[in-house]
Amino acid sequence: MGLLVDGVWTDQWYDTSSTGGRFERSRAVFRNWLTADGSPGPTGRGGFAAEAGRYHLYVSLACPWAHRTLIVRALKGLNDLIPISVVHWYMGKDGWTFADGEGVIPDPNEGVEMLHQLYTRAEATYSGRVTVPVLWDKQTRTIVSNESSEIIRMFNSAFDGLGAREGNYYPAAMRSAIDAVNDVVYPTINNGVYRCGFATTQAAYEEALTPLFDSLDQLEQRLTAQRYLLGSELTEADVRLFTTLLRFDPVYVGHFKCNLRRIADYPALFAYTRDLYQHPGVAATVNLNHIKRHYYESHHTINPTGVVPVGPEIDYGAPHGREALSTMT
């Protein structure tokens, strides 16, 4: 884990000494928008029009934030329009790399061996963390965005005129409700597991753990009565929650000490996770080998031995029985 300082790579773990042991996530820096006609989006500059083959997505199969973009890319049928590169699961002194390994897809555009080199191609004096996903514009040789929550919204609509599959996962009539769910799920669950795992004081850890499980308890009740977070329709809110739920029992329970309860202990949440996993196109985006090996092998401050647990055994393909809930909401 490292960062760039004025374009120079530095191997440095998160500093929690000035935050009372609390992990504080840095904000994404590249916030341009890919739009159907190249007009500017809510942030950044314009000029990034949807075109087949112009853009490239860099991801880690381990990362829940990158996983969001892979799922929406699959749901919208964009696999042929937006090719991908996949970094190695191990994040060492050089950060994300394209070292040889199962599932790794090298960079065909700039030929970089380390992801931080792509960042400095886009901005030579860049300072900040080097994260995935990265949406790259091959035409202008720059990063369009490294903010996953915005990339999935670009994928949701920008390519609709170029043969994208039908489906709107952020419909106008539901946006306020989706945003309200995201505003709870992101800080307490998506980022909450990291706040637990990267905490360096007992107080900071417990401060994150309580709202995490309060939110999971509330979602268990919500999903007992309806198939998806917003009712009978799959939305981006479900995608954003799923990537954390999938990693919870294999990684976060043990590695991040999120062990009050497992997702398997929540009947509705566990069935919901299996339901989403079995949604067409989603299972192909999941690589549990990358997920487990990344966390347990890369985070030396948390797991210095690098030993990866063999379990747990989870059958995400088992029947979920949630189909009937679609007719009840």
Segments and roles (model prediction):
Residues 1-329:
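C-terminal alpha-helical interaction module
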